Regions:
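Acyl-donor binding region in acyl/amide transferases
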Residues: 105-110, 122-186
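Residue-level detector of alpha-helical recognition elements and their boundaries
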Residues: 44, 65, 144, 195-196
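Short C-terminal domain-edge/linker segments immediately following a structured domain
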Residues: 13-19, 48-52, 149, 159-162, ...
Length: 223
C-alpha cells in the first residue's frame, strides 16, 4: 500500500518534491516541524539549531519540501469528474482545493524533511533522515510524507549511498513514528544502545529529577 503513494501518484496531483536552496529562510521548515510537535506532543528544535546544522554540514544538509500546486490538482480532479469517476467524492475534493486556493494561494507546502547526505569520501555512505514535519490540516490523504522519503531515497541512490537511515525505532514498534517507518520494510540493525556513566553523582541526580520537570513545563507553556 505504501508503494502506491510514490512517484506518479503525487506527480499527477500537482505535488513536487523540491530541495530548498541552501540560502533559503528556515521559517517555513520550522513551521512544518511545529505542526508535528503540536500533534504528537513532542519538542524538537528551534530555527537557530537548524542554522547550525546547515553551517556544520553545508550543502550536505538537504531540506526537502512536498510542494502542492493547487491549480494542477484542480485540473486533475476536473479531469476525473469529466470522465465520470467517483463524482460525489471528487466534487468534494475539488471544492476543498478551490477553497484552499482562496485561503492560501496556489502553492502550499504540505511537508518537509531534513536529510544529511554522507561525505563523498566516506567508505560506508549513509544518508541520515534526521527531522520531518507535516501539516495534516491540508490534504492529509495525499500522504506527502511518504513521497518525501521516496525523494530522499532516490537522491541517496543517485549519490551512491549504501543506506538511507530512517533513525531508531521503539522496541515494541507500537509508537506512531515506528509504525510509519515500518511501512518502508526497513532492514533493522540492532545495537547495544546507549547508557549514562555519571561522573558526578550529585549533579546527575539533579539532572535526572529536573529535566523531566523542565520538559513538562515547556509543554504547558506551548499549550
Amino acid at each position: 500500500k505504501t508503494r502506491y503513494y510514490m512517484g506518479s501518484f503525487h506527480n499527477s496531483k500537482g505535488i513536487e518534491f523540491i530541495k530548498a536552496d541552501p540560502d533559503d529562510d528556515l521559517s517555513e521548515f520550522v513551521r512544518l516541524l511545529g505542526q508535528t510537535e503540536k500533534r504528537q506532543g513532542i519538542s524538537l528544535r528551534n530555527e537557530e539549531y537548524f542554522k547550525k546544522i546547515r553551517h556544520a554540514f553545508g550543502d550536505r544538509a538537504v531540506i526537502y519540501y512536498a510542494r502542492m500546486h493547487l491549480d494542477r490538482y484542480v485540473e486533475y480532479l476536473e479531469g476525473l469528474i469529466a470522465k465520470k469517476q467517483n463524482i460525489p467524492e471528487n466534487t468534494r475534493k475539488l471544492d476543498e482545493a478551490k477553497a484552499l486556493i482562496e485561503e492560501k494561494g496556489n502553492t502550499v507546502n504540505l511537508a518537509a524533511s531534513l536529510v544529511i547526505m554522507p561525505d563523498p569520501q566516506a567508505k560506508l555512505k549513509i544518508a541520515e533522515y534526521l527531522y520531518a514535519g507535516s501539516d495534516l490540516s491540508v490534504l492529509s490523504t495525499l500522504c506527502a510524507s511518504v513521497g518525501l522519503i521516496y525523494a530522499g531515497v532516490c537522491d541517496s541512490i543517485d549519490a551512491g549511498c549504501d543506506y538511507f537511515n530512517l533513525g531508531g525505532v521503539d522496541g515494541s514498534f507500537e509508537d506512531h513514528l515506528s509504525k510509519f517507518k515500518i511501512k518502508f520494510v526497513p532492514h533493522i540493525f540492532e545495537y547495544v544502545g546507549e547508557f549514562d556513566m555519571p561522573v558526578d553523582k550529585v549533579m546527575y541526580l539533579g539532572f535526572e529529577k529536573l529535566l523531566p520537570m523542565a520538559k513538562k513545563a515547556i509543554k504547558k507553556i506551548k499549550k
